[in-house]
Amino acid sequence: MTDIYEKLRARLDDLANGYPATESKVEIRLLKRLFTEEEAELYLQLSPFLEKPQDVAKRLNREVEELSAMLERMAQKGHLFRKRNGDQVRYSAVPYVVGIFEHQLGRMDEGFARDHEEYFETAFGQTIQSFKTPVLRTIPVNRQMVADYPVAPFEDVLQIIENQKKIAVAPCVCRTTKKLVGHECDKPVENCFSFGSHAEYYVENGMGRFITIDEAK
C-alpha cells in the first residue's frame, strides 16, 4: 500500500513547480513536518480552485462543521489558501512553492529550514529544468510578430500600489530560512509585499502586518 506521504508528494508534484522525489527522501521528511496523516488525506481531496466548506463537505460526504474546522486549521498551518468575503469563506489547495513553503513564516524552525535547503539544492531547484515540456520554447508560426512590451517605469509601480485597498508587508521567507541555517545576510528582511485577499491571509495568519500606501512607497 502506498504511503500517504508518498501520495501527497505525487499530488504536489502535479501542481505548479512540482515536488520531485529524491533518494534521500528529504521531501517526505518535510511533508511529515508539515502534515498529520489526517491532513494529508484531506489535502489529496481538495481542489486548487477556491471552494466553500459546504461544497467540499457535500462532495466528500462529510459533516460540514467538522470539515470546516479542519480546513481552517490547515489554512492556519499554510497548507491551504483562505479567502473571505463577508461571512463566506473559501479554501484552496496550494503548491509547495509558491504556497506552503512561503506560508511557514513564523512557524518554521531550524530543522525545517535545513531540510528545505537540502531539498532545494538537491532536487527542487532543478525541477523547471527537468520538465519534459520546456517552460520556454520556440513555436514556429511562419509570420512576423510585433512585440511591444515596454518596461514599466517607476511611476507605474507607484500607481499599482496607489490602487491597492489592502497592503501587507512580511519577512522574506528566503532570507528567514537562510538565517535559520546560519547564513544571515545584511539585507533588509521585512520586504515582501502582498495585496488584497493575500494581504488579509498573511495578516490573519500572523505572517505579516498591514501598512499604508505611503509606507509601501
Regions flagged by a language model, labelled:
Residues A75-G86:
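A short, conserved structural fragment
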Residues Q88-G125:
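Short, amphipathic alpha-helical interaction segments positioned at domain boundaries
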Residues M1-I28:
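Long, low-complexity, charged/polar intrinsically disordered regions in eukaryotic proteins
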Residues P48-L60:
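Short acidic, hydrophobic short linear motifs in intrinsically disordered regions
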Residues Y43-L44:
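Hydrophobic residues on short alpha-helical segments
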Residues G125-K217:
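Catalytic cores of enzyme domains
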Residues L60-Q76:
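Short amphipathic alpha-helical interaction segments
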